[in-house]
């Protein structure tokens, strides 16, 4: 009997959450043990700036971006099929949500590729795209969940998704503002440093948003359990 989180296409959000969480935690543990960052509380990107943890961070976050794109596209196709049956949503709404989500995944790839201290402007742009598009995506998905309730979602699931979305939305604002107010980029933050409290608040909010995304994708598992993914292959003899 397969694990409940592997039924149907549920393996996609399950692997996404496990892999992403492991990517954050592994790079954090390595960077703290080596002494590259203080244990409380670095930015997520700070834990993937210096080698060897930068290699772990880049590899795992790049794969997370691809898993995220695959999960979002599957979610898009599920909603498309459901909408054909009950017509609860304008077609463009689903496409807009997918486009925003995929843009966030591209931002994630930029974060993984361009390290914080090496190319800060590009890295920061990628991070901003990731978090803003990610929050917009889960807000749109929460709205869609309410529109599809009770035919395709329970009211409890809708409330959980909206609660996570609101928390992420609230956290992403101070994350961005206090990041600017904290001043210059550095890895070795100390409580006596100017701007430390801004940095601390921003970093805590960043972790809240990041794991908020993971918690949100966990709620997709139930929806994906009744779905199968098929690959169709055709050979054109005149090619």
Swiss-Prot record:
<comment type="similarity">
    <text>Belongs to the DRAM/TMEM150 family.</text>
</comment>
<keyword id="KW-0812">Transmembrane</keyword>
<dbReference type="InterPro" id="IPR019402">
    <property type="entry name" value="Frag1/DRAM/Sfk1"/>
</dbReference>
<dbReference type="Pfam" id="PF10277">
    <property type="entry name" value="Frag1"/>
</dbReference>
<keyword id="KW-0053">Apoptosis</keyword>
<keyword id="KW-0472">Membrane</keyword>
<comment type="function">
    <text>Lysosomal modulator of autophagy that plays a central role in p53/TP53-mediated apoptosis.</text>
</comment>
<dbReference type="GO" id="GO:0006915">
    <property type="term" value="P:apoptotic process"/>
</dbReference>
<protein>
    <recommendedName>
        <fullName>DNA damage-regulated autophagy modulator protein 1</fullName>
    </recommendedName>
</protein>
<feature type="transmembrane region" description="Helical">
    <location>
        <begin position="15"/>
        <end position="35"/>
    </location>
</feature>
<feature type="transmembrane region" description="Helical">
    <location>
        <begin position="162"/>
        <end position="182"/>
    </location>
</feature>
<dbReference type="InterPro" id="IPR050911">
    <property type="entry name" value="DRAM/TMEM150_Autophagy_Mod"/>
</dbReference>
<feature type="transmembrane region" description="Helical">
    <location>
        <begin position="119"/>
        <end position="139"/>
    </location>
</feature>
<feature type="transmembrane region" description="Helical">
    <location>
        <begin position="201"/>
        <end position="221"/>
    </location>
</feature>
<keyword id="KW-0072">Autophagy</keyword>
<keyword id="KW-0458">Lysosome</keyword>
<feature type="transmembrane region" description="Helical">
    <location>
        <begin position="98"/>
        <end position="118"/>
    </location>
</feature>
<keyword id="KW-1133">Transmembrane helix</keyword>
<dbReference type="GO" id="GO:0006914">
    <property type="term" value="P:autophagy"/>
</dbReference>
<dbReference type="GO" id="GO:0005765">
    <property type="term" value="C:lysosomal membrane"/>
</dbReference>
<feature type="transmembrane region" description="Helical">
    <location>
        <begin position="54"/>
        <end position="74"/>
    </location>
</feature>
């Amino acid at each position: 009997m397969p694990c409940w989180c592997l039924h149907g296409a549920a393996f996609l959000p399950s692997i996404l959450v496990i892999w992403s969480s492991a990517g954050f935690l592994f790079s954090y543990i390595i960077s703290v043990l080596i002494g590259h960052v203080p244990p409380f509380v670095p930015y997520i990107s700070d834990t993937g700036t210096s080698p060897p943890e930068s290699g772990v961070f880049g590899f795992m976050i790049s794969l997370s971006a691809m898993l995220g794109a695959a999960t979002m596209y599957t979610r898009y196709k599920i909603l498309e099929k459901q909408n054909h049956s009950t017509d609860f949503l304008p077609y463009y709404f689903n496409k807009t949500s997918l486009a925003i989500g995929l843009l966030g995944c591209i931002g994630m790839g930029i974060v993984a590729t361009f390290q914080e201290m090496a190319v800060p402007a590009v890295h920061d742009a990628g991070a901003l795209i990731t978090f803003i598009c990610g929050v917009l995506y889960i807000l749109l998905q929460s709205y869609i969940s309410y529109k599809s309730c009770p035919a395709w979602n329970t009211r409890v699931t809708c409330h959980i998704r909206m609660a996570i979305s609101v928390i992420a939305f609230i956290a992403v604002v101070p994350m961005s503002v206090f990041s600017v107010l904290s001043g210059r980029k550095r890895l070795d933050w100390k409580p006596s440093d100017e701007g430390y409290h801004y940095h601390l608040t921003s970093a805590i909010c960043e972790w809240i948003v990041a794991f908020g995304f993971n918690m949100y994708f966990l709620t997709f598992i139930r929806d994906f359990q009744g779905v199968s993914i098929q690959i169709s292959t055709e050979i054109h003899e005149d090619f």
